[in-house]
Amino acid sequence: MTVINMKDVDLANKRVLIREDLNVPVKDGKVTSDARIRAALPTIKMALEAGAKVMVMSHLGRPTEGQYEEEYSLQPVATHIAGLLGQDVPLVKDWLDGVEVESGQLVLVENVRFNLGEKKDDEALSKKMAALCDVFVMDAFGTAHRAQASTHGVAKFAPIACAGPLLSAELEALEKALAKPARPMAAIVGGSKVSTKLTVLESLSDKVDQLIVGGGIANTFLAAAGFPVGKSLYEEDLIPQAKALMAKTSIPLPEDVVVATAFAPDAVATVKDAADVGPDDMILDIGPKAAAAFAALLEESQTIIWNGPVGVFEFDQFGGGTKALAMAIANSKGFSIAGGGDTLAAVDKYDIADQVSYISTGGGAFLEFVEGKVLPAVAMLESRAQN
């Protein structure tokens, strides 16, 4: 993959516009998980230390496009970055007509999704963004799969368009895991629906030696194998696809599960064999026997791709499975990549960030890369590098 790298561009006294993925959870005006912010900091610091006039942009949530909505303001993010850097980080609300910023100074510009035309990759909006800078840095792997004004259009029109260190590292790590993986290779795909991850499951089924499924996805596979799933979330219409996947690749199913009769923080957890799930039961985690069996597979693996928890780990009584797999990944001697929002929250919760080889900040982009799709923002950087 040939793109211009930010580290090879002279940034001194240049107006540098960096697109980061700072779409973090915010509650009561405070950032509750800052993994994506911390991942972006080295890029921001590198630009500041080079003497650049640094403007950072990102989206947050899904506001109504073209309208300011306070709950989606990046103010909590600006405050959080200021705390981490130990310097003021002003948030600029009306920024498309120009931003005042000095060399060595950082400003955050307000949520890109407040601008009409962002999602449609509007050309006029893209040109306004490009006019703000001498150098555009695409560093948001998490949005690289979307052709939008702040990820794709601006890269087309900026004087120089390059990849930031975070984006470059993401692409290198994913290529290492997918192009020439060390064997045996395992993947964990969790989440609520097979329908949203079907292409990922199909793509990985051709590559991996073991495909571990979790969450609501696993319930569809259990149903396909003839196990009772009670009132669990599952997709009956996708049972044929689940059967086809099980026929062509090794998808170990949990021999035991953790069930409850209600989905609630105080729900009582009961461990049952997979064959004994009752009509009123909801499967909310894999059981201890399954967790131990899957953990053993992971500890033997030389390459691990982890996307999605295997249970409702937000409630501790349904977090045992995800914790066991997280610890197995941490203990594995192989190359491991974790990606996707819920996955990052699990990495945080079980404090294994330092033991995972690479933590991908991308959710959808991570999955699309795994599927083998072209990421529009990366394709644009490649095309600019050639010209």
Curated annotation (Swiss-Prot):
GO CC term, one of those recorded: cytosol
Residues noted as binding substrate in the record, renumbered to the chain: D21, L22, N23, R36, H59, L60, G61, R62, R113, R146
EC id: 2.7.2.3
UniProt entry keywords in alphabetical sequence: ATP-binding, Cytoplasm, Glycolysis, Kinase, Nucleotide-binding, Transferase
Binding site for ATP: K197, E314, G340, G341, D342, T343
GO biological process, one term: gluconeogenesis
Listed pathway(s): Carbohydrate degradation; glycolysis; pyruvate from D-glyceraldehyde 3-phosphate: step 2/5
Catalytic activity as recorded in UniProt: (2R)-3-phosphoglycerate + ATP = (2R)-3-phospho-glyceroyl phosphate + ADP
Cysteine pairings via disulfide bonds: none
Enzyme class: transferase
Keyword Nucleotide-binding among record annotations: yes
Subcellular location: Cytoplasm
Keyword Transmembrane listed: no
Subunit structure: Monomer.
Family to which this protein belongs: Belongs to the phosphoglycerate kinase family.
Entry protein name: Phosphoglycerate kinase
